[in-house]
A protein has these predicted regions:
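Active-site catalytic motif of lipid deacylating hydrolases and related acyltransferases
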Residues: 23-98
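Serine-dependent carboxylesterase/thioesterase catalytic core
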Residues: 35, 80-182, 233
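Positively charged n-region of N-terminal signal peptides that target proteins for export
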Residues: 1-4
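C-terminal catalytic-base region of ester-bond hydrolases, centering on the histidine
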Residues: 192-290
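Sec/Tat signal peptide C-region and signal peptidase I cleavage site
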Residues: 17-23
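Bacterial N-terminal signal peptides
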Residues: 8-16
């Protein structure tokens, strides 16, 4: 792991001995992994957000970079941070474009940057993994609770304090972050103003907890969302995750939750391995000429 500048954590893949590395994930353009809400490239300073995914992709020939931004802010704020980091990546590598893979909210602020911040000429492909393109009932419930009790400001303020005091993250705005994850905001404000751009290949994946074994720590949320939006990963429904060319729903043997999609803070998931899955995404992008 190498820091190029403040605000960006980069996995700059150098292959001094190409013969010792695989090439099936050696895409034409660098791969950029962008994290979701509530964390950055490191989760609360405890563990890497992407775990062994970058290493496995590297071992198969990929050049991988990881962007890192404010975990709780508006889409616009995060998009500006992301744009600056991608521009730096392009300058360092000399590449003309990148392949973007975003998990959860990482598939939303990147969409905004591509559509509204002039980044479409620099993005060859866009892949979202369980991104709430049509919002999440979980965000609806949290924001409605705050409105009903009149505690929205207090709850958001407490969360901002936690991020700042306990985890050293400044400049968060949990209230606007939460609002911009609701189904109403995504459907009526975000999507109409964030059109897909010509020249960018869009694809997506979703996931389903499927069983209590797959749900793990997110089982309660999975069960709560199921009657409302059907199959879901404990935060994002399959119907909300679909964008562009939908490549399928990840389930493993017993189900996959929002965290186990990237192997984060979860028990082993039978029938699914996150590093292997992301490497397959890269291999497919390579086959498509990206």
């Amino acid at each position: 792991m190498k820091k190029i500048s403040v605000g960006i954590i980069v996995f700059l893949i150098v292959l001094p001995m190409v013969s010792m590395a695989g090439t099936k994930a050696a895409t034409k353009y660098p791969i950029v992994l962008s994290h979701g809400m509530g964390a950055n490239a490191e989760v609360m300073g405890i563990t890497d957000y992407w775990g062994n995914i970058p290493k496995t992709m590297r071992n198969n020939g990929a050049q991988v970079f990881i962007t890192s931004g404010n975990p709780m802010q508006s889409k616009e704020y995060k998009a500006i941070e992301w744009k600056a980091q991608v521009q730096e990546i392009l300058a360092i590598t000399g590449a003309q474009k990148i392949n973007l893979i975003g998990h959860s909210d990482g598939g939303l602020y990147t969409r905004y940057a591509i559509s509204n911040l002039g980044m479409s000429p620099y993005v060859a492909s866009y892949t979202s993994m369980s991104s709430p393109h049509r919002g999440s009932p979980v965000a609806d419930a949290i924001m409605n609770l705050g409105t009903t009790t009149g505690l929205t400001d207090a709850i958001a303020g407490a969360l901002d304090f936690v991020y700042g005091f306990l985890f050293g993250v400044s400049g968060t705005d949990c209230e606007i972050n939460g609002t911009q994850e609701t189904t109403w905001w995504m459907k009526t404000v975000f999507n109409p103003n964030v059109p897909d751009m010509a020249g960018v290949y869009y694809q997506s994946y979703g996931a389903d907890c499927k069983t209590v074994i797959g749900g793990q720590v997110m089982t309660a949320l999975w069960l709560a969302i199921k009657p409302i939006e059907g199959a879901n990963d404990g935060l994002v429904s399959v119907s909300s995750a679909k964008w562009g060319n939908y490549r399928g729903t990840l389930t493993g043997w017993f189900g996959i939750n929002h965290l186990s999609e990237i192997g984060l803070l979860s028990l082993p998931t039978l029938g699914y391995d996150a590093p292997t899955h992301f490497t397959k995404i890269a291999a497919d992008l390579k086959a498509r000429g990206f």
